[in-house]
Amino acid sequence: MQIKLANPRGFCAGVDRAIEIVNRALEVFGPPIYVRHEVVHNKFVVEDLRNRGAIFVEELDQVPDDVIVIFSAHGVSQAVRQEAAGRGLKVFDATCPLVTKVHIEVAKYSRDGRECILIGHEGHPEVEGTMGQYDASNGGAIYLVEDEEDVANLQVRDPNHLAFVTQTTLSMDDTSRVIDALRARFPNIGGPRKDDICYATQNRQDAVKQLAGESDVVLVVGSPNSSNSNRLRELAERMGTPAYLIDGAEDMQRGWFDQTARIGITAGASAPEVLVRGVIEQLKAWGATGAEELDGREENITFSMPKELRVRSLI
């Protein structure tokens, strides 16, 4: 069995920044540090931070007064921000800057009284945060659609004063079809010059398509609640290649690889490389040889840290 590795894979700049914000807050202020929602959707990362003193909660009413709170990479609604400010909580915002970009777009449509359509998955924390940027008091409204059927059933007030945005971690192919359906039904709809799916999502989806074409089975390292990891598994399957979403090596079954010559491995944007290495070691123990890194797109994007958490230079 030969191992092939997708490139790029694993951590993106937004995830790197979010995890580093929690790490630095623990170093600078000491535990406990409260984090609203899992800072990123990866069990290994969350457990590591929990062991170091991070306390993960779903709502601010679970947070005591006079503590530090971090908002997760997925972003939060304006109502959550207002609640934190009203209580005087010290907040560090780990929202991915590319999610913040979508928030800014939605807030602008809200101020203009322009109806907005969000393409995304109901119940995902990023979607909840983005929907929560819209203030309907200016006369507009925001709607959530997931597929072409939702578009066909959607009723808006003014089809000539309408715009769309997207969740950042969707399937590019699926989203393109939904956007086409929106433009066909609402010819005057506005939107971003380029859809809001982030660079890392695009790059990892392109890479898994290449990987699936060169593999007999694909392993996607990522947690079940990770949107972008699930999209990678779906893409591989659409390419006709069996694919499995795994948290790590312990989730693998030896029988998956019977009569298999080529095993492809990728990782979602919130999965650390140490988990990929663990998968490789287990496969080698089962007889796999080598680990060929496929050619891919280089990523050199970084996002700045909050000023109070930046590492000071030693003089």
Curated annotation (Swiss-Prot):
Entries under PANTHER family matching the protein: 4-HYDROXY-3-METHYLBUT-2-ENYL DIPHOSPHATE REDUCTASE
Pfam families: LYTB
Pathway participation: Isoprenoid biosynthesis; dimethylallyl diphosphate biosynthesis; dimethylallyl diphosphate from (2E)-4-hydroxy-3-methylbutenyl diphosphate: step 1/1; Isoprenoid biosynthesis; isopentenyl diphosphate biosynthesis via DXP pathway; isopentenyl diphosphate from 1-deoxy-D-xylulose 5-phosphate: step 6/6
Active site positions, chain numbering: E126 (proton donor)
Organism taxonomic ancestry: Bacteria, Pseudomonadati, Pseudomonadota, Gammaproteobacteria, Pseudomonadales
Keyword set includes Iron: yes
CC cofactor: [4Fe-4S] cluster
Protein name listed in UniProt: 4-hydroxy-3-methylbut-2-enyl diphosphate reductase
Residues holding (2E)-4-hydroxy-3-methylbut-2-enyl diphosphate: H41, H74, H124, T168, S226, S227, N228, S270
Organism per entry: Pseudomonas putida (strain ATCC 700007 / DSM 6899 / JCM 31910 / BCRC 17059 / LMG 24140 / F1)
